Swiss-Prot record:
It is found in: Cytoplasm; Nucleus; Cell projection, Podosome. The modification Asymmetric dimethylarginine is found at residue 866. This is Rho guanine nucleotide exchange factor 5. Residues 266-278, 323-368, 394-404, 474-490, 731-746, 950-969, 990-1012, 1057-1072 have a biased composition (Basic and acidic residues).
Length: 1597
């Protein structure tokens, strides 16, 4: 930053400024106008004259270019001394002009006379580029056109003037602050720039700018205060830009103003310049308004957006505050202007709409800039004034709507100038930034169309637009804006599908420049750069426009106008930009314009060498047509242009292309483009001019590959729309490999001629600075323009840019470049982009064959390649459904992401291959899908979620995609490489792919907004999930396959994860799979399901059971009817304690087998009966629950048992008792799950689990039996340690507080094995109930169920045996016999019930009245005898009588006694110790106690016939109950119990249907099932299991 600031401080020589002014933007524009059939034609001659003058100065500036290039490389502002000197003058002039309208008028005149207003000095150009290649130096537009435009829209000119003044004030403020800003020169004042250049080139004058303000003021469009406010805002914006933060507002305002001024310089130095200044003012005002609007979509709140911009720009310098103020000031005037201009633009809306209709015909509708205004006046608005007015109005509206950078405002001013030269071009410019500012582009375009904005030609707007796009704060907004802008562009005729493409077209239209002539400024080289709209205005680019072009890529978001402002350095950078080298990760900001525009530049003017051809009339026409409906008519093929950009750049560029559609991407592109510009400036100063060889959007599309998404957009619309005109003699500029920094890494980009070998027939008003070398064909007619549009020529070896983009792409891409790559993917790959260069203009309908790589999570499944149809730039062209671009990379954060190479994943190649690997249509279900179609472990499912893979990750997690895309854009430009870049690509491509919803998506992916996104998302927002997911992103796209594929192996245990990001995977409800949650040491197989859910088994089972309970409750009021195809309803109806599987499936909808994308999208379900579907769901639930169980075991073993700190607090015996054989249990479970998953993968539609359970039954017995048997010691040891070992307590507390435990205690982990084996039996029982009677599957299920049932019985017996033995030993120590003694301890004896009762005795009295006496008696009921004892001190008992169980009987007592004596029952001993009969009367405290004793004393009952118990009440357990006495029944949630008796005090006795166990339990734990049909169904299922078991026993016997 310091170096950049220093450079900013050093203003480049005025000669450089002159060089900019020399750039014949006006002639170009005039030619453009002529192509449009507007008055611009009349200006062609003056423009040519001016061009030659500019060439003369360019010759001088050539030296300055070197200096500028150097400055640009260092990213310093290029305020040249002359410009610096001029700045004060300009400031003074502006101040005067602002002070009084008279002074403004006088000044404009004087300035016009002397052409004091010069093109934005190189410093301006450099500054915009440096600050964030926010804007491309505006191209000077033909004065004549501007004059005409001014005449059409004096209000616009006044607005422009106001903007210029605001910029002047901004410049002054920036100068006062002593901060040199890239935009300071540009934004400080277009007037200041004009003065500098006016002194040298005499092309632009402040006076000119002032009159427009005056006009505006007089017309009510702009008030003096507003003008001042605009100026201040412009200054502030300039400050922000100077700070090096790519402020969209500042860049847009300052750069646009300056660019417009430059354009005016290029145009007539006199009145035209004044008009341009006016237009610029209007533009600036609009820009400010737009910026304000961007800040608040409809509130015109510049404050928020400005604050964000300030924060972003604050990174560079203190300019942000000024920028914000200026934005705020501009808002009001701009709003007023917007109102007035909107009215004007409305007049043109009809024409624009016409054009839009045309564009829509070509599929450009999606991204067409609202050209309603333009279409209405397509012929007339081509003058540029109308376009500017309409563009402004719309851009403001769009800004307000999108909260995005004030791209529309920028675009509007720029569009006006462009409209002067090339209303379409400027319009395109507007649209380009419009990936973010598409809606703005729409606004601007109409504005540009309606008012004669030729004065607006000054490429101020590009900067502003770029800045606005670049602003980080509006990534989300930008995305929306991008889509809207793209749409508006389509309407306008720009390649709306890819706003960048439109920009490219306009840029490509820039007239070919001679090597001497300054290379098309970034705007020219990259008119489509996010600086975008300003990119065209930078007609005054220095001869070194190549450097600008180079920058343009970097400043992708910052239109070339930023690059253009610095004739020397920027011009050099232009080639890089043109080449689509958003080489630096910073390029993301420019995606809107830069992505496509840059690529085309690379192929057109950007390409060095003779191939750089002047933009042919076709290009101009194309640009114009782009601006109008014609442009969108032919969707350029992103593939064609994507090849132009180096791979690395392409990756970023592509992303940027898409980014162009998204403001966030633009901002990211800006940053990247800045870096790339700094590197590219030097090597590609002359060559970069050539990238504009194809002025068409195709050219831009060619360059858009730099952005990644732009290729797709441009290729879709621009390429098709623009047919390469016969290349005029290509003027090969010195081809210098452009060095672009991608992700902060400098990359050498070899400037190459654009794919369109034809020299740009004419420089679009915005992007053409170099003198037009050949007659610029006039393409007023959209069809004509299209015809004139040069088709991208087949990639020539000379196209270094193309090779370079690949080279860069191949180079280790910084995280930032990754983002752009997704755009390139729409083609086939970065390489394929080269192949597509020569694509002839095709109907927009056809999108690139290969969809761009989907953004990570953010994008969500819409990005997946499966869908196959991506509409790049909103084009309907279908991409191969098989494309790999459907990469569901955005996986949940926990998922493993693509290998670090993933940073390049955004690259078209990487994304393509990844998408292919990831995208298996069947992999939608994260876990199960993975099973079906496991992807290579190297294919991370969560590239997006896993930020580590690249910086883009931040953008994604942001996210996100997430709306991943917006988050990606928000991420730094570097992040944009993978995140933003992808998101742009995802936007462009997803729309295409969205044609079919990704199979990956599972119903459990609520977060996946991208999944199955319709092709209509072509606006580039397809990424918005998102993206994301992944983010997105829930299981977003992580399918079953993915978890299994994850290298971590255990991280993704199940399907949902696969789709979680963008890919398919959410079949299982489980949430994101965590890579580390793999089965601890088990390496045999990477579990696909183990980490599919974030829930541990404890929580998972609770959730499932709770849902089961809820479904049962709902069924109470419903009759059991076969539900629809959905298995849930049937389950609900069949809910029973045994149907754990049903409950589990119902509990987690995401874990449903039917939700696996492969299953859901297949026809198998149609041929399956409802019962068969339920059976599969039950079996699948067994697998899913086992994965969750294993995850919990891994924590128990790895986190607790293997903890060294915990082990230090325990003795060996304590450690053995506490953990027993837990590790063995874990290993068996891991093997079991592995076999289950393998079985499932072998046949997902009819997989088996019972045979696997049966095969593992011996292993279960080997580990579960000893572990469960040790449970008693385990509990005691744990309790003892907690009570006596403080160290253990402290360490355990610390371990349990770890997030991995999810607030669960160690005890809950230790009891899991027994719980699991019990529930596993219940799951098998549910499977058995749904099998066909007599089938082999029923036999296997019965065997497996019986084996587990026997295991559980043995476990229970072992546990009880130990406990009973201990209890007998304890009692033997407490009991004494006063009667016959007998041995109490016996292995066959256990205590059934014990308690103290009150014995009632009647004593005989002399009066024959019996007296009732009471005494306490303690009963100990064993399974074989009963002891009666008297309690003693010390909990001791004295036995006075006992009897065998067979000789005792209890019964209710019907005796009515007076007093409190209730709850009585009789005990009869037929034979006591003495061999006599005895009778006792006992009283209990409660009725339940009485009933429980009577029940315990009763003889064992025969087993009930369940089919005869239909009238018996049933209850379902709501809360688990742990028995406190031996006669109580342990309950688990969802258990169904048939009630046999109940007491008045809230206790029930019943038989559990699942296993026939009997016992008592409190009524508070259960809920009665009132529906008789449900009760009958529960009984029927229980009977079915019982019958099958009996048959098996008989067979075995």
């Amino acid at each position: 930053m310091e170096a950049e600031e220093a450079q900013r401080g050093a203003s480049p020589p005025i000669s450089a400024i002159e060089e900019f002014s020399i750039i014949p933007e006006a002639p170009m524009r005039s030619s453009q106008v002529s192509a449009l059939g507007l008055e611009a034609q009349e200006d062609e001659d003056p423009s040519y004259k001016w061009r030659e003058e500019h060439r003369l100065s360019a010759t001088q500036q050539s030296e300055l270019r070197d200096v500028c290039d150097y400055a640009i490389e260092t990213m310093p502002s290029f305020p040249k001394e002359g410009s610096a000197d001029v700045e004060p003058n300009q400031e003074s002039l502006v101040a005067e002009a602002c002070d009084t309208p008279e002074h403004w008028e006088a000044v404009p005149q004087s300035l016009a006379g002397r052409q004091a207003r010069t093109l934005a000095p190189p410093e301006l150009w450099a500054c915009p580029i440096q600050s964030e290649h926010l804007d491309m130096a505006p191209f000077s537009s033909d004065l004549g056109s501007e004059e005409e435009e001014v005449e059409f829209w004096p209000g616009l000119t006044s607005l422009t003037l106001g903007s210029g003044q605001a910029e002047e004030e901004e410049e002054t403020s920036s100068d006062n602050s002593g901060q040199t800003r890239y935009y300071s020169p540009c934004e400080e004042h277009p007037a200041e720039t004009n003065q500098n250049e006016g002194s040298e080139s005499g092309t632009i004058r402040q006076g000119e700018e002032l009159p427009p303000e005056e006009l505006q003021e007089s017309q009510g469009l702009l008030h003096p205060q507003e003008v001042q406010v605009l100026e201040e805002q412009g200054q502030q914006e300039a400050g922000f830009r100077g700070e090096g933060t790519l402020r969209e507002d500042v860049c847009a305002d300052g750069l646009l103003g300056e660019e417009q001024m430059i354009e005016q310089v290029n145009d007539e130095k006199g009145e035209q310049k004044q008009k341009q200044e006016q237009v610029q003012d209007v533009m600036l005002g609009r820009q400010g308004e737009r910026m304000g609007l961007t800040g608040e979509p409809e509130g015109l709140n510049d404050g928020e957006w400005e604050q964000e911009d300030m924060e972003r720009k604050a990174q560079g310098q203190g300019g942000p505050e000024q920028g914000e103020e200026r934005k705020r000031e501009l808002q009001v005037p701009e709003e007023n202007r917007a109102d007035s201009q909107d009215e004007k633009s409305q007049t043109f809306l009809g024409k624009s709409e016409e054009v839009t209709g045309k564009q829509e015909d070509h599929g450009i509708k999606e991204k067409g800039v609202p050209v309603s205004g333009q279409e209405a006046k397509e012929p007339e608005s081509w003058d540029g004034g109308r376009l500017g007015a309409v563009g402004r109005a719309r851009s403001r509206e769009e800004e307000n709507e999108h909260h995005g950078p004030s791209m529309p405002a920028l675009i509007a001013p720029e569009d006006s100038p462009h409209c002067d030269l090339f209303p379409g071009a400027s319009y395109l410019m507007t649209q380009i930034p419009g990936t973010q500012t598409e809606s703005r582009a729409e606004e601007l375009s109409p504005a540009a169309l309606s008012p004669s904005l030729e004065p607006i030609r000054c490429s101020h707007q590009p900067i502003s637009l770029l800045g606005s796009f670049l602003t980080e704060e509006s990534p989300d907004k930008e995305i929306d804006q991008n889509s809207q802008q793209e749409e508006s562009r389509l309407r306008k005729g720009t390649v709306s599908s890819q706003g960048t493409e439109v920009v490219f077209a306009s840029a490509s239209v820039t007239p070919p420049r001679t090597p001497d002539s300054a290379p098309p400024s970034p705007a020219e080289a990259y008119p489509i750069t996010p600086a975008s709209v300003s990119a065209r205005p930078p007609v005054a680019f220095p001869r070194r426009e190549t450097s600008c072009a180079a920058r343009a890529p970097e400043t992708a978001s910052a239109p070339l106008s930023m690059d253009d402002p610095s004739p020397c350095g920027t011009s050099e950078m232009c080639p890089a930009a043109l080449y689509g080298f958003p080489s630096t990760g910073t390029s993301p900001p420019r995606p809107p314009a830069n992505s496509t525009g840059t690529v085309q530049h690379l192929r057109s003017d950007s390409f060095p060498g003779s191939h750089r051809t002047e933009q042919t009339p076709d290009l101009v026409g194309m640009l114009l047509s782009y601006s109008h409906s014609e442009l969108p008519q032919r969707p350029p093929k992103p593939a064609i242009y994507s090849s132009v950009t180096p791979r690395r750049d392409r990756r970023s560029g592509r992303d940027y292309s898409t980014v162009s559609a998204s403001p966030t991407a633009l901002s990211t592109l800006k940053q990247d483009s800045q870096e790339s510009i700094s590197n590219l400036e030097r090597p590609s100063s002359p060559p970069s001019i050539q990238p504009w060889v194809s002025p068409h959007n195709p050219a831009f599309a060619t360059e858009s590959p730099a952005y990644g998404s732009s290729p797709s957009f441009v290729s879709m619309e621009d390429v098709r729309i623009h047919e390469p005109l016969p290349p005029p003699p290509p003027q090969r500029r010195d081809t210098h490999p452009s060095v672009v920094e991608t992700d902060g890494h400098a990359r050498v980009v070899v400037p190459t001629l654009k794919q369109h070998s034809h020299p740009p027939p004419l420089a679009l008003g915005s992007g053409l600075h170099a003198p037009h070398k050949g007659p610029l064909p006039q393409a007023s007619d959209p069809a004509v323009a299209r015809q004139h549009r040069p088709l991208p020529s087949t990639p020539d070896s000379s196209h270094h840019a193309q090779a370079t983009p690949r080279w860069r792409y191949n180079k280790p891409l910084p995280p930032t470049p990754d983002l752009p790559q997704p755009h390139l993917p729409p083609i086939s790959a970065p390489g394929s982009s080269r192949i597509y260069r020569p694509l002839p203009p095709l109907p927009i309908i056809d999108p690139p064959t290969e969809p761009p790589p989907l953004p990570p999570k953010s994008r969500g499944r819409s990005r997946s390649t499966r869908g196959g149809h991506m509409n790049s730039g909103g084009h309907a062209k279908t991409r191969p459904a098989c494309q790999d671009w459907t990469v569901p990379l955005p996986a949940s954060a926990g998922r493993t992401s693509w290998p670090p190479a993933t940073a390049r994943s955004t690259e078209s190649f990487t994304s393509t291959s990844r998408s292919k690997s990831e995208v298996s249509p069947g992999m939608a279900f994260s876990n199960m899908t993975n099973f079906l179609c496991p992807s290579s472990p190297t294919t991370p499912w969560t590239p997006e979620l896993q930020g580590p893979t690249s910086k883009d990750e931040a953008g994604v997690s942001e996210h996100p995609e997430a709306p991943a895309r917006e988050p990606l854009r928000r991420t730094t430009p570097q992040q944009g490489a993978s995140g933003p870049g992808r998101s742009p690509v995802g936007q462009a491509r997803q729309p295409e792919k969205p044609s079919h919803l990704h199979l990956e998506k599972a119903s459990s992916w609520p977060h996946r907004r991208d999944s199955g996104r319709p092709p209509g998302d072509s606006s580039g927002q397809a990424v918005a999930p998102s993206e994301g997911a992944n983010k997105h992103k829930g299981w977003s796209r992580q399918g079953l396959r993915r978890p299994s594929i994850l290298p971590e192996g255990s991280s993704d245990s199940r399907g949902p994860a696969v789709e979680k990001h963008p890919g398919p995977s959410d079949t299982v409800v489980f949430r994101e799979k965590k890579p580390k949650e793999v089965m601890g040491g088990f390496s045999r197989r990477c579990s696909k399901l183990i980490n599919s859910s974030q829930l541990l088994y404890q929580e998972y089972s609770d959730v499932v059971l709770n849902k089961e309970i809820q479904s049962q409750q709902r069924l109470e009021s419903l009759s059991e009817t076969p539900g629809p195809s959905s298995p849930r309803q049937p389950r609900k109806a069949l809910v029973s304690s045994e149907s754990y599987l049903q409950r589990l499936s119902m509990a987690s909808s995401g874990s449903l087998w039917q939700e696996i994308p492969v299953v859901r999208n297949s026809t198998v379900l149609l041929s399956m009966t409802h019962e068969d579907q339920k059976l599969q769901e039950v079996k699948f639930e067994l697998i899913v629950s086992e994965a969750s169980y294993l995850r919990s075991l891994n924590i128990a073993v790895d986190h607790f048992q293997l903890s060294t700190s915990l082990r230090a607090t325990l003795s060996n015996q304590e450690h053995q008792w506490l953990f027993s054989r837990l590790q063995d249990v874990r290993d068996v479970s891991a093997t079991f799950l592995s076999d289950l998953e393998e079985n499932f993968e072998n046949n997902i539609f009819s997989f088996q689990v019972c045979d696997v359970v049966l095969n593992h039954a011996p292993d279960f017995r080997r580990v579960y039996l000893p572990y469960v048997t040790n449970q008693t010691y385990q509990e005691r040891t744990f309790q003892s340690l907690m009570n006596s070992n403080s160290n253990f307590r402290e360490v355990l507390e610390k371990l349990e507080s770890d997030p991995v435990c999810q607030r669960l205690s160690l005890k809950s982990f230790l009891i899991l094995p027994f719980q699991r084996i019990t529930r596993l039996k219940l799951l098998l029982q549910n499977i058995l109930k749904r099998t066909q009677p007599g089938s082999s599957e029923e036999a296997e299920a019965t065997k497996a169920h019986h084996a587990l049932e026997q295991l559980i019985r043995d476990c229970n017996n072992n546990v009880q045996s130990m406990r009973r033995t201990e209890e007998l030993i304890y009692l033997s120590q407490k009991i004494e016999f006063e009667c016959k003694i007998f041995p109490l301890i016996s292995q066959s004896r256990w205590l059934v019930k014990s308690g103290e009762l009150t014995a009632l005795e009647f004593s005989a009295s002399p009066g024959l009245r019996r007296k009732l006496n009471t005494r306490p008696v303690h009963l100990h009921l064993f399974n074989d005898c009963l002891l009666l004892s008297r309690p003693r001190e010390g909990s001791r008992f004295l036995v006075f009588d006992h009897a065998p169980f067979s000789s005792i009987r209890g019964e209710k007592c019907e005796m009515k006694l007076h007093g409190p004596h209730k709850n009585l029952f009789r005990l009869f001993l037929r034979q006591n110790t003495q061999g006599a009969q005895a009778e006792f009367l006992f009283r209990t405290e409660t009725q339940s106690e009485k009933l429980r004793w009577i029940s315990a004393l009763a003889m064992p009952r025969e087993e009930l016939d369940l089919l005869e118990c239909y009238n018996s009440p049933q209850v379902q357990c709501l809360r688990a109950y742990k028995p406190r006495e031996n006669d109580e029944l342990a309950l688990e949630k969802a258990d169904v119990v048939m009630v046999t008796q109940q007491s008045s005090d809230g206790w029930l006795e019943g038989v559990r249907l699942s296993d026939g166990e009997r016992g008592w339990f409190p009524v508070q734990q259960v809920e009665f099932i009132s529906n008789p049909e449900v009760r009958a169904q529960n009984l029927k299922e229980a009977h079915r299991v019982k019958t099958a078991k009996l048959q098996l026993v008989e067979q075995q016997a």
